[in-house]
Amino acid sequence: MFQLRPYQQEASDAAVDFFNSKSEVNAIEVLPTGSGKSLVIADIANRLDGHTLVFQPSKEILEQNFAKLCSYGVMDCSIYSASFNSKKISRITFATIGSVIHHKEQFHHFNNVIIDECHLVNAKGGMYEEFIRETKCKVLGLTATPYRLSTSSWGAMLKFITRTRPRIFGKVIYQVQIQQLLQMGFLSELDYFYCPPKGYNEANLRDNSTGADYTDRSVVQEFQRIDFYSWLVSIVRRLLTPKDGKKRNGILVFTRFLKEAERVANDIPNCAMVSGDTKKAERERILNAFKTGEIQVVVNVGVLTTGFDYPELDTIVMARPTKSLSLWYQIVGRAIRPSPYKQKGWIVDLCGNLNRFGKVQDLELVEPKPNMWQVVSNGRPLTNVNF
Protein backbone atom coordinates (compact mmCIF):
# COMPACT_ATOMS: atom_id res chain seq x y z
CA MET A 1 0.00 0.00 0.00
CA PHE A 2 1.84 3.11 1.25
CA GLN A 3 3.64 4.36 4.34
CA LEU A 4 2.48 7.61 5.91
CA ARG A 5 4.79 10.07 7.59
CA PRO A 6 3.93 10.74 11.26
CA TYR A 7 2.13 14.04 10.59
CA GLN A 8 0.24 12.49 7.65
CA GLN A 9 -0.95 9.70 9.94
CA GLU A 10 -2.06 12.29 12.50
CA ALA A 11 -3.98 14.19 9.81
CA SER A 12 -5.65 11.00 8.59
CA ASP A 13 -6.55 9.91 12.12
CA ALA A 14 -8.06 13.32 12.90
CA ALA A 15 -10.15 13.18 9.73
CA VAL A 16 -11.46 9.67 10.38
CA ASP A 17 -12.35 10.65 13.96
CA PHE A 18 -14.18 13.71 12.61
CA PHE A 19 -16.28 11.72 10.15
CA ASN A 20 -17.07 9.10 12.79
CA SER A 21 -18.11 11.71 15.35
CA LYS A 22 -21.39 13.61 15.72
CA SER A 23 -19.84 17.01 15.01
CA GLU A 24 -22.43 19.54 13.83
CA VAL A 25 -19.94 21.74 11.97
CA ASN A 26 -17.76 21.10 8.96
CA ALA A 27 -14.01 21.15 9.45
CA ILE A 28 -10.72 21.82 7.72
CA GLU A 29 -7.17 20.51 7.87
CA VAL A 30 -4.27 22.78 6.93
CA LEU A 31 -1.40 20.95 5.23
CA PRO A 32 1.41 22.99 3.64
CA THR A 33 2.35 22.77 -0.02
CA GLY A 34 4.64 19.79 -0.50
CA SER A 35 3.34 17.93 2.56
CA GLY A 36 1.71 15.14 0.54
CA LYS A 37 -1.93 16.19 0.76
CA SER A 38 -3.01 13.78 -2.00
CA LEU A 39 -1.62 10.84 -0.02
CA VAL A 40 -3.47 11.97 3.10
CA ILE A 41 -6.72 12.24 1.13
CA ALA A 42 -6.20 8.75 -0.30
CA ASP A 43 -5.66 7.28 3.16
CA ILE A 44 -8.66 9.05 4.66
CA ALA A 45 -10.99 7.95 1.86
CA ASN A 46 -9.73 4.37 2.00
CA ARG A 47 -10.30 4.11 5.78
CA LEU A 48 -13.80 5.57 5.92
CA ASP A 49 -16.95 3.48 6.04
CA GLY A 50 -19.61 4.11 3.43
CA HIS A 51 -19.31 6.19 0.28
CA THR A 52 -16.85 9.07 0.04
CA LEU A 53 -16.96 11.88 -2.53
CA VAL A 54 -13.66 13.67 -3.15
CA PHE A 55 -13.91 17.02 -4.95
CA GLN A 56 -10.86 18.18 -6.90
CA PRO A 57 -10.49 21.80 -8.07
CA SER A 58 -9.69 21.07 -11.73
CA LYS A 59 -9.63 18.22 -14.22
CA GLU A 60 -5.81 18.33 -14.33
CA ILE A 61 -5.43 17.91 -10.58
CA LEU A 62 -8.23 15.32 -10.53
CA GLU A 63 -6.42 13.24 -13.13
CA GLN A 64 -3.11 13.55 -11.28
CA ASN A 65 -4.48 12.71 -7.83
CA PHE A 66 -6.75 9.90 -9.05
CA ALA A 67 -3.74 8.26 -10.69
CA LYS A 68 -1.90 8.55 -7.36
CA LEU A 69 -4.85 6.99 -5.55
CA CYS A 70 -4.82 4.00 -7.90
CA SER A 71 -1.03 3.69 -7.62
CA TYR A 72 -1.43 3.32 -3.85
CA GLY A 73 -3.43 0.14 -4.45
CA VAL A 74 -6.90 1.59 -3.83
CA MET A 75 -9.18 -0.16 -6.33
CA ASP A 76 -12.80 0.60 -5.38
CA CYS A 77 -12.69 4.09 -6.86
CA SER A 78 -13.92 5.94 -9.94
CA ILE A 79 -14.15 9.32 -11.67
CA TYR A 80 -17.35 11.33 -12.05
CA SER A 81 -16.44 14.11 -14.46
CA ALA A 82 -17.70 15.16 -17.87
CA SER A 83 -14.16 16.18 -18.81
CA PHE A 84 -13.16 12.50 -18.70
CA ASN A 85 -16.40 11.24 -20.24
CA SER A 86 -16.81 9.19 -17.08
CA LYS A 87 -19.70 9.29 -14.64
CA LYS A 88 -19.09 6.23 -12.53
CA ILE A 89 -19.95 6.07 -8.84
CA SER A 90 -17.92 3.84 -6.51
CA ARG A 91 -17.15 3.64 -2.81
CA ILE A 92 -14.61 6.41 -3.44
CA THR A 93 -15.60 8.82 -6.21
CA PHE A 94 -13.33 11.60 -7.45
CA ALA A 95 -15.25 14.44 -9.06
CA THR A 96 -15.33 18.07 -10.08
CA ILE A 97 -18.13 20.19 -8.68
CA GLY A 98 -19.25 21.32 -12.14
CA SER A 99 -20.09 17.75 -13.14
CA VAL A 100 -21.87 16.90 -9.89
CA ILE A 101 -23.92 20.02 -9.25
CA HIS A 102 -26.73 19.16 -11.69
CA HIS A 103 -26.90 15.56 -10.48
CA LYS A 104 -26.91 16.08 -6.72
CA GLU A 105 -29.61 13.46 -6.23
CA GLN A 106 -27.12 10.75 -7.19
CA PHE A 107 -24.96 11.59 -4.17
CA HIS A 108 -27.46 11.89 -1.32
CA HIS A 109 -26.38 8.48 -0.01
CA PHE A 110 -22.75 9.58 0.38
CA ASN A 111 -21.67 9.68 4.02
CA ASN A 112 -18.50 11.69 3.58
CA VAL A 113 -17.38 14.59 1.40
CA ILE A 114 -13.77 15.76 1.10
CA ILE A 115 -12.95 19.02 -0.69
CA ASP A 116 -9.38 19.49 -1.87
CA GLU A 117 -8.26 23.15 -2.05
CA CYS A 118 -11.24 24.09 0.12
CA HIS A 119 -10.27 27.77 0.18
CA LEU A 120 -12.05 27.91 -3.20
CA VAL A 121 -15.41 27.36 -1.48
CA ASN A 122 -17.43 30.59 -1.43
CA ALA A 123 -19.68 30.63 1.63
CA LYS A 124 -21.88 33.33 0.06
CA GLY A 125 -22.89 31.24 -2.92
CA GLY A 126 -21.68 29.12 -5.80
CA MET A 127 -21.78 25.45 -6.68
CA TYR A 128 -20.00 24.16 -3.59
CA GLU A 129 -22.27 26.12 -1.26
CA GLU A 130 -25.36 24.89 -3.13
CA PHE A 131 -24.23 21.26 -3.00
CA ILE A 132 -23.40 21.37 0.72
CA ARG A 133 -26.63 23.18 1.61
CA GLU A 134 -28.94 20.89 -0.36
CA THR A 135 -27.31 17.55 0.43
CA LYS A 136 -26.67 18.43 4.09
CA CYS A 137 -23.53 16.32 3.90
CA LYS A 138 -20.64 16.26 6.33
CA VAL A 139 -17.64 18.00 4.82
CA LEU A 140 -13.91 18.05 5.46
CA GLY A 141 -11.81 20.56 3.55
CA LEU A 142 -8.06 20.43 3.01
CA THR A 143 -5.88 23.35 1.96
CA ALA A 144 -2.47 24.93 2.33
CA THR A 145 -3.96 28.44 2.16
CA PRO A 146 -6.94 28.63 4.57
CA TYR A 147 -8.13 32.14 3.75
CA ARG A 148 -10.36 33.97 1.28
CA LEU A 149 -10.54 37.55 0.12
CA SER A 150 -13.35 39.66 1.52
CA THR A 151 -14.07 43.16 0.24
CA SER A 152 -16.24 45.94 1.62
CA SER A 153 -16.42 49.72 1.77
CA TRP A 154 -13.69 49.48 4.41
CA GLY A 155 -11.30 47.84 1.97
CA ALA A 156 -9.99 44.35 1.32
CA MET A 157 -9.26 41.70 3.93
CA LEU A 158 -8.02 38.11 3.90
CA LYS A 159 -10.36 36.18 6.16
CA PHE A 160 -9.47 32.82 7.69
CA ILE A 161 -12.10 30.47 6.27
CA THR A 162 -13.39 29.41 9.69
CA ARG A 163 -14.11 33.10 10.42
CA THR A 164 -16.18 34.08 7.38
CA ARG A 165 -19.81 35.20 7.46
CA PRO A 166 -21.71 33.16 6.38
CA ARG A 167 -19.59 30.20 7.41
CA ILE A 168 -19.24 26.75 5.85
CA PHE A 169 -16.24 25.45 7.80
CA GLY A 170 -16.46 25.82 11.56
CA LYS A 171 -13.23 24.47 13.00
CA VAL A 172 -9.65 23.39 12.35
CA ILE A 173 -9.17 19.76 13.35
CA TYR A 174 -5.53 19.44 12.30
CA GLN A 175 -2.70 21.66 11.14
CA VAL A 176 1.04 21.33 10.74
CA GLN A 177 3.39 24.29 10.39
CA ILE A 178 5.76 24.80 7.46
CA GLN A 179 8.64 25.27 9.89
CA GLN A 180 7.90 21.90 11.50
CA LEU A 181 8.18 20.11 8.14
CA LEU A 182 11.41 21.95 7.36
CA GLN A 183 12.91 20.87 10.67
CA MET A 184 11.89 17.27 10.00
CA GLY A 185 13.48 17.40 6.54
CA PHE A 186 10.22 16.95 4.66
CA LEU A 187 10.52 20.29 2.84
CA SER A 188 13.44 21.95 1.09
CA GLU A 189 15.26 24.94 2.55
CA LEU A 190 14.85 28.14 0.54
CA ASP A 191 17.14 31.10 -0.10
CA TYR A 192 15.52 34.40 -1.09
CA PHE A 193 16.97 37.13 -3.30
CA TYR A 194 15.25 40.49 -3.67
CA CYS A 195 16.44 41.97 -6.96
CA PRO A 196 14.19 44.87 -8.00
CA PRO A 197 15.14 46.87 -11.09
CA LYS A 198 16.62 50.31 -10.51
CA GLY A 199 13.91 52.88 -9.88
CA TYR A 200 11.11 50.40 -9.24
CA ASN A 201 8.44 52.15 -7.16
CA GLU A 202 5.45 50.27 -5.77
CA ALA A 203 3.77 53.57 -4.96
CA ASN A 204 2.99 53.88 -8.67
CA LEU A 205 0.86 50.72 -8.60
CA ARG A 206 -2.90 51.12 -8.20
CA ASP A 207 -5.39 48.74 -6.61
CA ASN A 208 -8.11 47.23 -8.75
CA SER A 209 -11.81 47.71 -7.98
CA THR A 210 -11.87 44.93 -5.36
CA GLY A 211 -8.62 45.95 -3.70
CA ALA A 212 -7.43 42.37 -4.15
CA ASP A 213 -4.56 43.14 -6.51
CA TYR A 214 -3.02 45.76 -8.75
CA THR A 215 -4.51 46.95 -12.02
CA ASP A 216 -2.97 45.72 -15.25
CA ARG A 217 -2.65 49.30 -16.46
CA SER A 218 -0.63 50.54 -13.48
CA VAL A 219 1.70 47.53 -13.61
CA VAL A 220 2.26 47.97 -17.36
CA GLN A 221 3.00 51.67 -16.93
CA GLU A 222 5.50 51.05 -14.13
CA PHE A 223 7.18 48.23 -16.05
CA GLN A 224 7.52 50.43 -19.13
CA ARG A 225 8.83 53.38 -17.10
CA ILE A 226 11.76 51.38 -15.71
CA ASP A 227 12.23 48.97 -18.66
CA PHE A 228 11.37 46.02 -16.46
CA TYR A 229 11.58 43.60 -19.37
CA SER A 230 15.30 44.19 -19.95
CA TRP A 231 15.95 43.65 -16.24
CA LEU A 232 13.99 40.38 -16.24
CA VAL A 233 15.94 39.03 -19.21
CA SER A 234 19.26 40.01 -17.61
CA ILE A 235 18.32 38.20 -14.38
CA VAL A 236 17.37 35.01 -16.21
CA ARG A 237 20.61 35.09 -18.20
CA ARG A 238 22.63 35.51 -15.00
CA LEU A 239 20.83 32.54 -13.46
CA LEU A 240 21.67 30.44 -16.51
CA THR A 241 25.37 31.19 -16.00
CA PRO A 242 25.87 31.46 -12.20
CA LYS A 243 29.23 32.61 -10.85
CA ASP A 244 29.84 29.32 -9.06
CA GLY A 245 29.35 27.45 -12.33
CA LYS A 246 26.73 25.13 -10.84
CA LYS A 247 23.84 24.72 -13.25
CA ARG A 248 20.35 25.26 -11.83
CA ASN A 249 17.82 22.41 -12.01
CA GLY A 250 15.35 24.40 -14.04
CA ILE A 251 14.29 28.05 -13.87
CA LEU A 252 10.56 28.71 -13.63
CA VAL A 253 9.49 32.29 -14.32
CA PHE A 254 6.10 33.69 -13.31
CA THR A 255 4.94 36.71 -15.30
CA ARG A 256 1.65 38.55 -15.47
CA PHE A 257 1.40 39.35 -19.16
CA LEU A 258 1.30 37.06 -22.19
CA LYS A 259 3.25 39.35 -24.51
CA GLU A 260 6.01 39.69 -21.93
CA ALA A 261 6.25 35.90 -21.57
CA GLU A 262 6.35 35.43 -25.34
CA ARG A 263 9.24 37.91 -25.62
CA VAL A 264 11.22 36.14 -22.91
CA ALA A 265 10.69 32.79 -24.63
CA ASN A 266 11.97 34.28 -27.89
CA ASP A 267 14.97 36.09 -26.40
CA ILE A 268 16.30 33.40 -24.03
CA PRO A 269 17.84 30.20 -25.49
CA ASN A 270 16.36 26.87 -24.39
CA CYS A 271 13.29 28.67 -23.08
CA ALA A 272 9.60 27.90 -23.61
CA MET A 273 6.31 29.47 -22.57
CA VAL A 274 3.09 27.98 -21.24
CA SER A 275 -0.19 29.75 -20.57
CA GLY A 276 -3.84 28.91 -20.21
CA ASP A 277 -4.06 28.85 -24.01
CA THR A 278 -1.34 26.22 -24.43
CA LYS A 279 -2.78 22.93 -25.69
CA LYS A 280 -2.54 20.04 -23.26
CA ALA A 281 -0.25 17.94 -25.46
CA GLU A 282 2.09 20.88 -26.07
CA ARG A 283 2.15 21.76 -22.37
CA GLU A 284 3.05 18.17 -21.48
CA ARG A 285 5.80 18.15 -24.10
CA ILE A 286 7.29 21.39 -22.76
CA LEU A 287 7.13 20.33 -19.11
CA ASN A 288 8.62 16.90 -19.83
CA ALA A 289 11.48 18.58 -21.72
CA PHE A 290 11.87 20.98 -18.78
CA LYS A 291 12.19 18.09 -16.34
CA THR A 292 14.81 16.32 -18.49
CA GLY A 293 16.85 19.53 -18.91
CA GLU A 294 16.28 19.86 -22.64
CA ILE A 295 14.45 23.10 -21.86
CA GLN A 296 16.20 25.12 -19.13
CA VAL A 297 13.68 27.92 -18.61
CA VAL A 298 9.88 27.90 -18.61
CA VAL A 299 7.97 31.18 -18.50
CA ASN A 300 4.33 30.84 -17.51
CA VAL A 301 1.29 33.06 -17.27
CA GLY A 302 -1.57 32.09 -15.00
CA VAL A 303 -0.68 28.39 -14.76
CA LEU A 304 1.70 26.07 -12.86
CA THR A 305 0.82 27.67 -9.51
CA THR A 306 -0.86 24.41 -8.47
CA GLY A 307 -0.67 20.83 -9.63
CA PHE A 308 2.86 21.06 -11.08
CA ASP A 309 4.95 18.43 -9.31
CA TYR A 310 8.69 18.71 -10.02
CA PRO A 311 10.67 18.30 -6.76
CA GLU A 312 14.04 18.82 -8.50
CA LEU A 313 13.07 22.38 -9.49
CA ASP A 314 15.33 24.77 -7.58
CA THR A 315 14.82 28.26 -9.04
CA ILE A 316 11.74 30.49 -9.12
CA VAL A 317 11.73 33.98 -10.63
CA MET A 318 8.78 36.05 -9.42
CA ALA A 319 8.45 38.65 -12.16
CA ARG A 320 5.11 40.12 -11.13
CA PRO A 321 3.86 42.08 -8.13
CA THR A 322 0.82 40.75 -6.31
CA LYS A 323 -1.25 41.50 -3.25
CA SER A 324 -2.37 37.87 -3.10
CA LEU A 325 -0.78 35.90 -0.26
CA SER A 326 -2.20 32.69 -1.77
CA LEU A 327 -0.52 33.35 -5.11
CA TRP A 328 2.81 34.17 -3.47
CA TYR A 329 2.70 31.03 -1.36
CA GLN A 330 1.64 28.79 -4.25
CA ILE A 331 4.40 30.12 -6.49
CA VAL A 332 7.13 29.80 -3.87
CA GLY A 333 5.77 26.35 -3.07
CA ARG A 334 6.86 25.09 -6.50
CA ALA A 335 10.45 25.02 -5.16
CA ILE A 336 9.83 23.80 -1.62
CA ARG A 337 9.46 20.10 -2.37
CA PRO A 338 12.59 18.21 -1.29
CA SER A 339 14.82 16.30 -3.67
CA PRO A 340 18.23 14.63 -3.31
CA TYR A 341 19.21 16.51 -6.46
CA LYS A 342 19.04 19.98 -4.91
CA GLN A 343 20.50 21.56 -1.81
CA LYS A 344 18.27 24.63 -1.54
CA GLY A 345 15.61 26.30 -3.61
CA TRP A 346 16.18 29.85 -4.84
CA ILE A 347 13.37 32.41 -4.84
CA VAL A 348 14.28 35.46 -6.91
CA ASP A 349 11.75 38.24 -6.33
CA LEU A 350 11.83 41.24 -8.67
CA CYS A 351 8.71 43.05 -7.48
CA GLY A 352 8.56 43.59 -3.71
CA ASN A 353 6.55 40.52 -2.76
CA LEU A 354 9.14 39.38 -0.24
CA ASN A 355 8.81 42.64 1.69
CA ARG A 356 5.02 42.43 1.55
CA PHE A 357 4.53 38.85 2.74
CA GLY A 358 7.85 37.68 4.13
CA LYS A 359 9.43 34.27 3.64
CA VAL A 360 7.04 31.37 3.22
CA GLN A 361 8.83 29.39 5.93
CA ASP A 362 7.98 32.19 8.38
CA LEU A 363 4.22 31.84 7.79
CA GLU A 364 2.55 30.43 10.87
CA LEU A 365 -0.96 29.51 11.97
CA VAL A 366 -1.78 30.84 15.43
CA GLU A 367 -4.87 30.61 17.64
CA PRO A 368 -4.78 33.60 20.05
CA LYS A 369 -8.30 32.72 21.23
CA PRO A 370 -10.22 29.43 20.93
CA ASN A 371 -11.15 28.82 17.27
CA MET A 372 -9.94 32.33 16.29
CA TRP A 373 -7.23 31.24 13.88
CA GLN A 374 -5.08 33.60 11.84
CA VAL A 375 -1.96 33.51 9.68
CA VAL A 376 1.05 35.56 10.78
CA SER A 377 4.52 36.21 9.38
CA ASN A 378 7.13 36.83 12.08
CA GLY A 379 4.30 37.84 14.37
CA ARG A 380 2.72 40.24 11.85
CA PRO A 381 -0.93 39.34 11.10
CA LEU A 382 -1.69 38.69 7.43
CA THR A 383 -5.31 37.55 7.82
CA ASN A 384 -8.30 39.28 9.38
CA VAL A 385 -6.65 42.69 8.91
CA ASN A 386 -7.38 45.28 6.23
CA PHE A 387 -4.76 45.82 3.54
Place the predicted regions along the sequence by residue.
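Walker A/P-loop
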Residues: 22-44, 254, 274, 299
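Conserved RecA-like P-loop NTPase helicase motor core
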Residues: 98-104, 121, 275-369
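Post-DEXD/H (motif II) to motif III coupling segment of the RecA-like Helicase ATP-binding lobe
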Residues: 120-191
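Inter-Walker segment of RecA-like/P-loop motor cores
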Residues: 71-105
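Conserved pre-motif I regulatory segment
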Residues: 1-30
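Conserved interdomain linker/interface between the two RecA-like ATPase lobes of SF2 helicase motors
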Residues: 167-252
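Conserved Walker A/P-loop ATP-binding site and its immediately adjacent core
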Residues: 33, 38-71, 256-258
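Conserved helicase ATPase core of P-loop NTP-dependent helicases/translocases
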Residues: 63, 78-89, 252, 260-263, ...
